């Protein structure tokens, strides 16, 4: 381990509680981790214990509701201590005792709830808020204003929940949140809070709710019981449901930095022992849940400001897994602790691996949010695109095979590599053959843009892991019925992937696939048409625009990003906003019919116009490569399709399907 990284393992205190190192499991939505009575289930316990086992010093649970009457949530959705305190203490004790066995501490994150950003599938179409304001997700729905008495009930519920948490063995609590536009944050922001009672008006009044919460907890649990606060110094709200991009000039409608500084001082003076800082809101979700289009360490400039104005530890998340970045952030005084959320979904052992000088063995988070936020927004259990066992560690972990088999895998894309990894871990003798001279499949062209560097890192990780596991890899070997039969495998997995759909345009010769352009096999010129406004088309357009090209997207649907996915809201919204911000022209409900001497002919709802361009780049989806399977299916009955060869889907389902099949060989 580099000397610089040693600071990541220095102890630190939150209040009087000592944490063994600087790593924090960032609190994340606990989908699938609780019982109907608000207590923790086995999945939830195993999830948090696994991260403690991986070396994280402070475990923070996902959001836990303090009550379920004022803002009634469908159960089971989130834990809640006050529904059945006895069961909560029983299951909580099992969790905290096991977490403590690894030398970690654990905080329970307590929440007042969602308010105007309530998830309809959880709360329904009735929402509460500080004032009568529009709902974030339900057009035409106005939130009910909470009464003064209800606010005071919330404060008492926070105190009661913290007492229960302390009895369950939690070392402290985190308050959720003067952050991201949740209910407590809505009270703190004048854009949302129009009240005239003691909880509205001045900044001090708008923060009264959050201040009374920490004071109530300290009164019940003792002044030494640590309480941290999830806090956003800036909201990045342009308007209702509209966020501001990096480097974009706009009028902040939420909390801006000067008020954020004053608010932080007031909150710390009220008794908060640490600030878990970030920026953003549900109106600018791509700040709170940063996609791959955001810079790594995006919160550091803002938390550095907090560090200078308050005297409590500052915790920073935001794509911070690289030890070079995280250690420098601490040494340069920008933060005190490093919170990892999604990276610890991808690999629970990041702190241990860095300590053991094995950072190259860390499975990278892609910031795709397909397995975490993408699933939570669809009311599914939390997991990870690149780690299928995440959130179901015990029931879905890998075990040694009872019978060792000879396994042949055809294709070295992500499905093939994952199947090889899983089969080898289970003890099988694995050979992987790949027709190209490299591994990675479609992720290789997809990983070309700078903002997709973690895709490239995933391929590199697989290469290293497969080598460590002793998988025999044969590149530049095309599979055939003859050489598969000659190999004599007990199991054959065909991960032959998918190939881009093609398109012929009358009169045009410079029509290229997005793959050929990304791999720099073709020169597109200076003016480019992208045919297809799905994920590949939009990301290719953004990449070309960053090179100074003039880019037009032509899409048959009525908007871009309508087909495929589903994408997490944050990724979807940021990509659309980046397309607009970068002045990439979008022609929706349109198609290119032909090319003439004047240019490409655009047909929009029956009306024709001309687009002058040097070339057209086709990104209209992929087709499964099933030819080999069709050829061998009757002669080699133990051959099975996996990944895109079985069904074209996103990277998560390619990996998950490969894991499932290889797990059961």
Curated annotation (Swiss-Prot):
Protein encoded by which gene: fldZ
Signal peptide: none
GO BP terms: L-phenylalanine catabolic process
Listed EC numbers: 1.3.1.-
Catalyzed reactions: 3-phenylpropanoate + NAD(+) = (E)-cinnamate + NADH + H(+)
Intrachain disulfide bonds: none
Annotated Pfam families: Oxidored_FMN, Pyr_redox_2
Entry annotation: catalytic residues: 182 (proton donor)
Protein name (record): Cinnamate reductase
Keywords, alphabetical: FAD, Flavoprotein, FMN, Iron, Iron-sulfur, Metal-binding, NAD, Oxidoreductase
Entry binding sites for FAD: 415, 434, 442, 452, 479
Molecular-function GO terms, alphabetical: 2-enoate reductase activity; cinnamate reductase activity; FMN binding; iron-sulfur cluster binding; metal ion binding
Record-linked PANTHER family: 2,4-DIENOYL-COA REDUCTASE, 2,4-DIENOYL-COA REDUCTASE [(2E)-ENOYL-COA-PRODUCING]
Family recorded in the similarity comment: In the N-terminal section; belongs to the NADH:flavin oxidoreductase/NADH oxidase family.
Pathway info: Amino-acid degradation; L-phenylalanine degradation
Positions bound to FMN: 109, 230, 319, 341-342
Residues the record lists as binding [4Fe-4S] cluster: 365, 368, 372, 384
């Amino acid at each position: 381990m580099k000397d610089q990284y040693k600071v990541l393992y220095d102890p630190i205190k939150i209040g009087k509680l000592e944490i063994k190192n600087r790593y924090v499991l960032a609190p994340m939505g606990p989908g699938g981790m609780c019982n109907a009575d608000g207590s923790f289930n086995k999945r939830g316990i195993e999830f948090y214990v696994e991260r403690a086992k991986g070396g994280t010093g402070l475990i923070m649970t996902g959001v836990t509701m303090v009550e379920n009457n004022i803002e009634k949530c469908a159960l089971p959705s989130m834990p809640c201590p006050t529904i059945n305190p006895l069961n909560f203490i029983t299951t909580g004790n099992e969790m905290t005792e096991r977490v403590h066995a690894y030398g970690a501490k654990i905080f329970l994150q307590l929440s007042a709830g969602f308010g105007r950003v309530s998830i309809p599938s959880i709360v329904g179409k009735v929402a509460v808020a500080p004032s009568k304001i529009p709902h974030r997700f339900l057009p035409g729905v106005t939130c009910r204003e909470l009464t003064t008495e209800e606010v005071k009930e919330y404060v008492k519920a926070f105190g009661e929940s913290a007492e229960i948490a302390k009895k369950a063995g939690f070392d402290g609590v985190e308050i959720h949140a003067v952050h991201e536009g949740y209910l407590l944050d809505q009270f703190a922001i004048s854009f949302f809070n129009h009240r005239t009672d003691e909880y509205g008006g001045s900044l001090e009044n708008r923060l009264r709710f959050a201040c009374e919460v920490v004071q109530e907890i300290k009164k019940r649990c003792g002044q030494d019981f640590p309480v941290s606060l999830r806090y956003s110094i800036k909201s990045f709200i342009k308007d209702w449901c509209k966020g501001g991009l990096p480097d974009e000039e706009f009028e902040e409608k939420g909390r801006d930095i000067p008020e954020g500084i004053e608010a932080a001082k007031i909150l710390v003076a009220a008794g908060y022992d640490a600030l878990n800082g970030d920026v953003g809101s549900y109106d600018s979700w791509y700040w709170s849940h940063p996609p791959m289009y955001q810079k790594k360490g995006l919160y550091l400039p803002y938390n550095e400001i907090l560090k200078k104005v308050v005297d409590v530890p500052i915790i920073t998340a935001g794509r911070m897994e690289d030890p070079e970045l995280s250690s420098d952030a601490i040494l340069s005084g920008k933060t005190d602790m490093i919170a990892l959320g999604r990276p610890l979904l991808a690999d629970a052992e990041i702190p241990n691996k860095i300590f053991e000088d094995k950072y190259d063995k860390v499975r990278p988070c892609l910031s795709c949010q397909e397995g975490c936020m993408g699933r939570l927004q669809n009311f599914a259990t939390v997991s990870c695109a690149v780690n299928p066992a995440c959130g179901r560690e015990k029931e879905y972990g890998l075990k040694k095979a009872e019978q060792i088999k000879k396994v042949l895998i055809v294709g070295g894309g992500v499905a093939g590599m994952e199947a090889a990894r899983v089969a080898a871990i289970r003890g099988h003798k694995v050979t992987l053959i790949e027709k190209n001279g490299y591994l990675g499949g479609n992720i290789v062209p997809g990983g070309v843009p700078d903002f997709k560097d973690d895709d490239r890192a995933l391929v590199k990780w697989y290469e290293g892991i497969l080598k460590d596991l002793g998988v025999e890899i044969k590149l530049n070997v095309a599979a055939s019925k003859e050489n598969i039969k000659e190999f004599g495998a007990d199991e054959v997995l065909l991960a032959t992937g998918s190939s881009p759909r093609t398109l012929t345009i009358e009169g045009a010769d410079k029509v290229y696939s997005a793959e050929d352009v990304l791999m720099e096999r073709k020169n597109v010129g200076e003016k480019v048409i992208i045919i297809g406004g799905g994920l590949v088309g939009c990301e290719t357009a953004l990449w070309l625009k960053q090179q100074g090209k003039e880019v037009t997207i032509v899409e048959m649907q009525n908007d871009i990003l309508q087909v495929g996915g589903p994408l997490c809201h944050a990724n979807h919204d940021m990509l659309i906003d980046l397309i607009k911000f970068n002045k990439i022209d979008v022609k929706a409900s349109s198609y290119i019919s032909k090319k003439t001497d004047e240019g490409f002919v655009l047909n929009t709802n029956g009306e024709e116009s001309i687009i002058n361009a040097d070339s057209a780049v086709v990104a209209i989806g992929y087709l499964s490569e099933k030819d080999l399977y069709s050829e061998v299916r009757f002669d080699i009955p133990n051959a099975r399709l996996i990944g895109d060869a079985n069904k074209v889907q996103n990277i998560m389902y390619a990996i998950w399907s490969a894991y499932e099949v290889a797990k059961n060989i």
